[in-house]
Amino acid sequence: MHGLLLAAGLLSLPLHVLAHPQPSTSTSLAGRAGAVDLNEFRIAHRSSYTSHDEMKKLPSIASFRQGTYLEVATELVKQTIPNMEFRLVDDHYVGDSGIGHVRFRQTMHGIDIDNSDFNVNVGKDGKVLSHGNSFYTGPAPSSNPMVKRDFIDPMQALHGVRKALNLPIKADGAHVEDMSEHKVMFKGTSGALSDPTAKLCYMAKEDGSLALTWRVETDIGDNWLLSYMDAKESSKVHNVVDYVAHATFQVYKWGLADPTEGKREILTNPWNLKTSPLTWLSDGQNNFTATRGNNAIAQYNPDGGNDYENNYRPSPKNLKFEYPYSPDMNPPKTYIDASVTELFYTSNVCHDLYYMLGFNEKAGNFQVNNRGQGGKGNDFVILNAQDGSGTNNANFATPPDGQPGRMRAYIWTRANPPRDASFEAGTIIHEYTHGLSNRLCGGPANSRCLNAIESGGMGEGWGDFYATAVRLKPNDTRKTNYVKGGWVNNSPKGVRMYPYSTDMNVNPLVYTSNNKLNEVHAIGTVWCTMLYEVLWNLIDKHGKNDGPVPIFENGVPNDGKYLAMKIVMDGMAIQPCNPNFVQARDAILDADMNLTKGANKCEIWKGFAKRGLGVGAKFDPKNRTGSTQVPNECK
């Protein structure tokens, strides 16, 4: 099933289409009258994380070594939680940092417990580096539900979800087709972009009990939902996950955040053949003359629909994607060729840079043709420019590996003339990073691991962090402040509570600020603020590479900027499903331990501690404890 994660946009958008508007206090179904607040259905935080330092205190386990990394990981699960029923998730891989990432799903009577996962990270030495665990340990159901089948049928579940969430789906006359023992597809519905499905699974509830549910998947465009309907009571929805978080090329060159930072240039063959060996205009089987290739397909989508294959996209003679554009041009459709080209360019550069940093085929990146390098193909990113389904936002939908991602870039009406999100690179990088974080956290096959309020906030924070790191200029120092979304929003304050700054007087956010925040974009601002501190600590130590790509020495970026981007990315793959800030911090420390043998431990600790996530910081969803302490060796 989809592990889609709705990548939130720059701001808080309705529901989970992640986008950029003004911060709001709730997340509701996009565009729905009387919309349901999805925050009420978020999955509760249940994960634990055993860091590398904690593993060293458990020599009998940490030193366990036998066979392949899969065998080591499997044995660890058996030793840690004996007599549990589980299965290996088929998305394990060894990342480019040498860490073997293995994930397991708990089962009961052969039925998945959909939010019970165990991830094991095996180091290059064959020993367990760290692990995360959210396995259910409460009482097991006394009987197999498949024997008596005393649960509602899937059609009742679909109707229940439709009614409970006010979804625009009609199912009168629809019928069910079996896909597997526990999964069905609904044929004959209308109102969804693809046929809805339902899968029978358990959900571990916040009160420690287990609920049998139908996981109903519905893609209605702005929201791509996994709704967990109680299998005994068709009016009770336990949880909801939203997957949407929302030649020559004349473009604003990579590194320019928006049109205020520079002029457009004509670039020849801007792809990197090490990361896009088929170029951006081929999938290995077909060569294209339009904005389509192995990594992405970009088009004009004025009606906001899903028929992207037949939508207009520029297809110039001689592959010269050179079109006029000025922010003063109006209406926006007069420069649609330039808009689609810019969106295609920025997204492809994201693909290439993230590939260099470790987001490759095995890790679940977005490509049609994986060229035998692992992972699942047929999943480029669908890029919709000037998407007509909304305004003042952008969003990204991240299904599991093997299914295309989808980005929608909207027109912003806060200025006159309106502004096109395709031309604010920070917006597009933020959205693309939702695809990165949702595929890495939980593994390529599970896009449901950034759904708790704090992990969802980190999803927003990572988007801002990568967009900000990319836009750093040669003369920037730790005193440089950056706002998010200032150009599209026509506001010097941007779309966040505070600028990103290392000055506590400019940005006072600390870990305990989260105690008063209940919206993912606001929480994400706290997380990115911490990462910005770590970024500058590493730059001050290692310098800053102002080029468009990292330079590696023995697999390690030789500057602070790209090193920060690398270990933050590695941390995403190491951390448990639905992590909290403390666990994600520890995963970054473990990523540095693996990559550099902990050479940057103190710089990382000091960055987090300055913002209250030091030694002694504790997570509690209602009463977080802050700490400015660092380990003794860092004082």
Swiss-Prot record:
Signal peptide per UniProt: 1-19
Active site, per annotation: E431
Function in brief: Secreted metalloproteinase probably acting as a virulence factor.
InterPro entries linked: FTP_domain (IPR011096), Fungal_virulence_M36 (IPR050371), Peptidase_M36 (IPR001842), Peptidase_M4/M1_CTD_sf (IPR027268)
Subcellular location field: Secreted
Residues engaged in binding Zn(2+): H430, H434
Originating organism: Trichophyton verrucosum (strain HKI 0517)
UniProt record similarity statement: Belongs to the peptidase M36 family.
Protein name listed in UniProt: Probable extracellular metalloproteinase 1
Class in the EC hierarchy, top level: hydrolase
Enzyme Commission code(s) on record: 3.4.24.-
Positions of the propeptide removed during maturation: 20-246
Gene Ontology CC annotation, any one: extracellular region
